[in-house]
Design a protein with these regions (language model features):
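Basic nucleic-acid-binding alpha-helical/helix-turn surface characteristic of O6-alkylguanine DNA
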Residues: 1-112, 116, 162, 166-179
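Short glycine/serine-rich loop segments
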Residues: 116-158
């Protein structure tokens, strides 16, 4: 069974939907993101300890602070490549960013290969089922372009600003993905 709970965010953000298998956090999405409906099918609302823990994390985060803990989560269908990307995203400090290319270089170095596709990294970043907590919003284009966020570019900009990033380093392209 999949359980769901809704989190009311500050006004500059879309609200958030949280999924659980009853024990672990299994999904966290902005309510109006492109895949929202598929995460609401066959879900039951229920008060769960994992929802309480996740809401505590979100409350701290949306107050502009690094929560300092991570709710226990489980990701289904996690390939080794996706795990590498998620592990790197989990190590991007609060208030900092990496580029898709930075991540591809880290993976290539770890694997002992010359190159890794930044586009493949983008696919793995976009696949992330637990936004914010696994900070895919901290991954940006090489030139500072803010594209590729399934939660919507408005939310990505607001998340980076909340973390006190220097927003002069970034721009929203006129055309691109996830605008």
């Amino acid at each position: 069974m999949t359980y769901i709970c809704k989190y009311k965010t500050p006004s500059e953000f879309s609200d958030i939907l949280i999924n659980s298998d009853g024990e672990y956090l299994t999904g966290l999405w902005f309510e109006h993101s492109r895949d929202t409906l598929k995460h609401m099918i066959d879900c039951e609302e229920k008060k769960l300890p994992i929802f309480k823990e996740t809401i505590k994390w979100l409350d701290i985060y949306f107050s502009g602070k690094n929560p300092g803990f991570t709710p226990k989560y489980k990701i289904n269908n996690l390939t080794p490549f996706r795990k590498e990307v998620i592990d790197i995203m989990n190590n991007i400090p609060f208030g900092e960013t990496l580029t898709y290319n930075d991540i591809s270089k880290l993976i290539a170095k770890k694997r002992g290969i010359k190159r890794m596709s930044a586009q493949a990294v983008g696919g793995a970043v976009g696949w992330n089922p637990i936004c914010i907590i696994i900070p895919c919003h901290r991954v940006v284009g090489t030139n500072g372009s803010l594209t590729g966020y399934s939660g919507g570019i408005k939310n990505k900009v607001a998340l980076l600003a909340l973390e006190k990033n220097d927003m002069n380093k970034y721009f929203v392209p006129k055309r691109g993905t996830a605008l």
